[in-house]
């Protein structure tokens, strides 16, 4: 019975830490870039795109295809950085214990 009470207490504490971590993630912003910094994309902690910054040199209609590719690459870079940050925060909550394969938090 004592072990069960201890497990329940740990579960409650972990839930509180996870909620705190989720709030922290939601408040952060991550910026990814591509094209040697010519395109920057900013995501919030939920992964929603909030801003795109494009070097004026890429506004040339002849460079439109490259610009489109760089926006996609910058989004992928920002998402990768966000996933890494979320993983770091989750390890803090779980004491370094990795999540089961395929289980991602908070997305």
Swiss-Prot record:
List locations, semicolon-separated: Cytoplasm, Nucleoid
What is the source species?
Answer: Gluconacetobacter diazotrophicus (strain ATCC 49037 / DSM 5601 / CCUG 37298 / CIP 103539 / LMG 7603 / PAl5)
UniProt-listed HAMAP family: DNA_YbaB_EbfC
InterPro entries, per this entry?
YbaB-like_sf, YbaB/EbfC
What UniProt keywords apply to this chain's record, in alphabetical order?
A: Cytoplasm, DNA-binding
Q: Which positions make up the signal peptide? A: none
Q: Which domain of life is it from?
A: Bacteria
Subunit composition? Homodimer.
Cellular component (GO) terms are: bacterial nucleoid; cytosol
Task: State what protein this is by name.
Answer: Nucleoid-associated protein GDI3467/Gdia_2910
UniProt similarity note: Belongs to the YbaB/EbfC family.
Biological function: Binds to DNA and alters its conformation. May be involved in regulation of gene expression, nucleoid organization and DNA protection.
The UniProt GO MF terms for this protein read:
DNA binding
Principal location listed in the UniProt entry: cytoplasm
Q: Reply yes or no: does the keyword Cytoplasm apply.
A: yes
